[in-house]
Amino acid sequence: MMVSYVVSVRFISGFVFGAGSGIAALKLYLYEEEKTDSESSVHRLIERFGLPQTGAETRFYINHILSYDQSRRTPRWVAEHLSGQRLQGQADRKHCKFKPDPKIPELFTARNEDYLRSGWSRGHMAPAGDNKISEQAMAETFYLSNIVPQNYENNAGFWNRLEIYCRDLTLRFSDVWLVSGPLLLPQVREDGRRIVSYQLIGEDDVAVPTHLYKVILAQKDSTLALGAFVVPNAPIGFERPLTDFQVSLSDLERMSGLTFFPEVDRAEQLKNLCEVDSCQLMDFTQFTLYISGRKVKSARTLARLEKVMTELRDAGITPDDYLTNLYLEKKRELVEKEKKPEQ
């Protein structure tokens, strides 16, 4: 009889404890539900007429993706993917014109007039040279949503050489991903204060970046190599190697407020691009030959063609076989063209 009594007490105690716990859990659940409903009601009231919009949502184009900074009238970041195949094509930039991006509200867009006589060039973040795959893809790189005010010498020189290096990486890697954009970094004053100061151009107050960044992620088989670079928006001579401007990815993320390639396992996968590859940009002679080749291709008269070759010789540079053959082919083309009106 005593055993039966003990079992009954234990059963009842367990039942009461379990029931009590269940009631407590139910009360907690109902409280949380009520709290959530109350918060939702408050949130709905706050959101009644909408919340502020930054316009920083991801925008997709044929061959690049970007996020736009409406307050500064420049991109926050521009992302691309390069491969040997995707760099092929016949699109020509002579058919493209800089213009406001139709996807950007008129109130927040930059205009060509902002750059006119400003002392700054219109610098591509996704370069036209990466987009020969189609006329439309190249034309979209001329939208001002992909453009920042850039120092002329930097745009035509160091930054151009960096873009060429990125394209050349597709000869050694199967896939190359790029993220490029502007930075506004502080300068240290004499009194030790760190001050962010930057110029605005045009009636639309387009922000002139103090620096530009480019993050390169290259893949070959299972190898992933990354390099992050921060470049002053100023002239940079041929004596400065690219590695002078290499920074850690975490430092760039701190400067920019962006997280790059979040799906990559950095601890396990990433190698230093400049250790896996050369990070070697074209030197003066190589770059001059490259630019001369572009001028030869675009020459429309024999006089212009000969001027290109004369300038090259005056610089003390001997044309390589590629440029010599390109010159002879272009010369034959222009001679035939000048003969036609006489026939």
Whereabouts are the PLM-identified features?
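Domain-level detector for secreted/extracellular nuclease and nuclease-toxin modules, and
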Residues: M2-Q343
